[in-house]
């Protein structure tokens, strides 16, 4: 009898997924694609030293980097801003420690290492090695990066560069 009832229950189930399941699957796929694109772009830009990856294929034309000194807006300005990391650190190494997302938002925890052997935002080479950790909040739309805001310990960066006052 139990097998008969179980058989009726199974046969009466709708094998078609609910709209809620379809929407959830679509959302998971979007987040996964955003994370993959974002990770690929920054690996190529910094580790691959290919600043030209910052282009209209991967970034919104009005890409914005929110900084303490004011927003950096547009592909060319954004590219020039991040190129400072390549000119300042010829051995730059960028690793994403962790990354996760929800909807159009991505959060990455990162590590940046390198030897300061070139001009870095107007700071002449110090020859010092840095090992910096930080977090970036990212907004994506339509499979493109729209906005970024980096958070890291500026005092730690300046200390590692030997640019803080000694006590």
What are these regions (language model features)?
Residues 51-103:
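A solvent-exposed, acidic/Ser-Thr-rich amphipathic alpha-helical stretch
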Residues 131-159:
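Short beta-strand edge/turn micro-motifs at domain boundaries
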Residues 13-57, 166-167:
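Short, low-complexity N-terminal intrinsically disordered segments enriched in polar/charged residues
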